């Protein structure tokens, strides 16, 4: 818009190439390819100190290699074929206070992958497979900037996240079926004291994985020292 309160960018691409057989033996060295890509990113300023951002990406890709590319894969002597459909979207809200001492973000994203494949030789009718995968996450983050906390300016960061991953993978002809659901809930906190010469960071993260007993704690510590402007010494744990 003319007042820059909202905007959108859209892109797309189509790509296609034939399979390449360099020595004329009837088998490709480079696969045939068909691909379409579409995406967008938009934003809306909901206030002087807040903004909403949305993104979406779509990819469809088909690849085929081997011989007799015009026939179904199981009618070729050697065939490698894979087709992907990938859709990804995200939504994010950002807010900060007039003096920038408080920042808050809330976000969510998801991705769905659909994959069908064939990897076989000798006209094998059992070499087909299919995969479906849905992953999504949501969370929030808060940052508080202090002009002085105990002995130095600092930034306090707190956050919550939740991730879920559902996977179904099938190769029916070989009797292989995989189904898995993973859920992870997380909380993290850290405080970083810093000035132009020193920085001290202490923090930790708690993760609860549905396939792991108990809560996983991951500590974090970082020390930075700049004896002169062009020298940076750092130790991390």
Describe these PLM feature segments.
Residues 1, 6, 36-40, 85-91, ...:
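Hydrophobic, lipid-facing positions within transmembrane beta-strands of outer-membrane proteins
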Residues 1-2, 43-47, 94-100, 141-149, ...:
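Structural signature of outer-membrane beta-barrel channels/translocons
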Residues 151-157, 161, 170, 175-237:
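Structural signature of Gram-negative outer-membrane beta-barrels, strongest in the C-terminal barrel
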Residues 2, 30-34, 79-85, 130-134, ...:
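Short sequence motifs at beta-strands and strand-loop junctions characteristic
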Residues 10-12, 40-42, 54-56, 91, ...:
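Membrane-embedded beta-strand positions of outer-membrane beta-barrel proteins
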Residues 14-18, 58-62, 97, 110-114, ...:
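Transmembrane beta-strands of outer-membrane beta-barrel pores
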Residues 5-8, 18, 48-52, 98-104, ...:
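Repeated loop/turn-to-beta-strand initiation elements of outer-membrane beta-barrel proteins
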Residues 17-37, 43-45, 49-104, 110-133:
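Flexible loop and strand-edge segments within Gram-negative outer membrane beta-barrel domains
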């Amino acid at each position: 818009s003319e007042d820059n309160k909202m905007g959108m960018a859209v892109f797309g691409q189509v790509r296609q190439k034939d399979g390449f057989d360099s020595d004329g033996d009837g088998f490709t060295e480079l696969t045939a390819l068909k691909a379409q890509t579409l995406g967008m990113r938009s934003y809306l300023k909901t206030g002087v100190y807040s903004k909403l951002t949305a993104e979406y990406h779509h990819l469809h890709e088909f690849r085929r290699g081997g011989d007799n590319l015009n026939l179904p894969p199981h009618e070729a002597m050697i065939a490698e074929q894979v087709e992907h459909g990938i859709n990804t979207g995200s939504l994010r809200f950002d807010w900060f206070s007039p003096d920038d001492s408080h920042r808050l973000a809330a976000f969510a994203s998801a991705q769905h992958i659909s994959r069908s494949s064939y990897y076989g030789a000798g006209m094998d009718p059992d070499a087909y497979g299919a995969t479906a995968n849905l992953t999504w996450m949501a969370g929030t983050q808060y940052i508080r900037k202090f002009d002085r906390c105990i002995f130095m300016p600092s930034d306090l960061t707190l956050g919550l996240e939740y991730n879920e991953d559902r996977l179904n993978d099938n190769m029916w002809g070989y009797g292989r079926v995989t189904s898995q659901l993973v859920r992870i809930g997380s909380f993290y906190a850290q405080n970083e004291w810093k000035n132009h010469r020193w920085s001290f960071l202490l923090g930790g993260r708690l993760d609860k994985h549905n396939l792991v007993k108990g809560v996983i704690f991951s500590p974090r510590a970082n020390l930075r020292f700049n004896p002169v402007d062009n020298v940076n010494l750092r130790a991390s744990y």
